[in-house]
């Protein structure tokens, strides 16, 4: 009797990555966010929107931007679970609204004790935001990075990183969104760490 062959993970070849623009520490208004749409190694589109500094609208705005580009998208990348300070993304809701898996990527494991303290002591609505971070689960090591995920297996996350990490450890859609955000906001992205 033949040995069953495990299901091959589908190759996730079309993705969008989001990053927020730099902002001054004292800034309290909206912060621009940028998304870079990739098909394999090729940049196909750039989108932008706005989220409130330390606000509650990141999930809604990301859902809107992803849905507008969703025809061929297969994956959403985020560099961290929050945009514009502590505007925390509800990963489960973003996955449910867009129908796409969501992969949060970080170079280092976050210091959750410090994040929890800051949220609960200094940020309006911090308890709700902390619950969203807890619901997302622990960050897991994956391909030399740390990830949180909604809607995909760890092996699929590793395969996606293999597909999109072209010029370093950070996936190209995130790297590009980061460079665009810095370039548009500061006039140049030279010298930025990605």
Swiss-Prot record:
It comes from the Bacteria. Transmembrane segments: none annotated. InterPro entries: Endo_dU. Belongs to the UPF0215 family. This is UPF0215 protein DR_A0167. It comes from Deinococcus radiodurans (strain ATCC 13939 / DSM 20539 / JCM 16871 / CCUG 27074 / LMG 4051 / NBRC 15346 / NCIMB 9279 / VKM B-1422 / R1).
């Amino acid at each position: 009797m033949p040995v069953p062959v495990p299901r091959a993970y589908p190759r996730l070849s079309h993705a969008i990555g989001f990053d927020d623009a730099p902002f001054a520490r004292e800034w309290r208004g909206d912060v621009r966010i940028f998304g870079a749409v990739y098909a394999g190694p090729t940049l196909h589109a750039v989108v932008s929107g706005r989220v409130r500094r330390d606000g509650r609208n990141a999930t809604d705005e990301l859902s809107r931007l992803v849905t507008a580009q969703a025809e061929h998208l297969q994956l959403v990348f985020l560099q961290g679970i929050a945009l514009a300070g502590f505007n925390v993304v509800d990963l489960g809701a973003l996955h449910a609204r867009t129908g796409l898996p969501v992969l949060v990527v970080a170079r280092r494991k976050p210091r959750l004790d410090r994040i929890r303290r800051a949220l609960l002591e200094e940020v309006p609505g911090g308890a709700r935001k902390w619950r969203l971070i807890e619901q997302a689960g622990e960050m897991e090591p994956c391909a030399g990075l740390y990830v949180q995920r909604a809607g995909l297996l760890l092996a699929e996350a590793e395969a996606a990183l293999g597909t999109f990490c072209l010029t370093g450890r950070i996936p190209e859609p995130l790297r590009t969104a980061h460079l665009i955000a810095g370039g548009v906001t500061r006039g140049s992205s030279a010298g930025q760490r990605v």
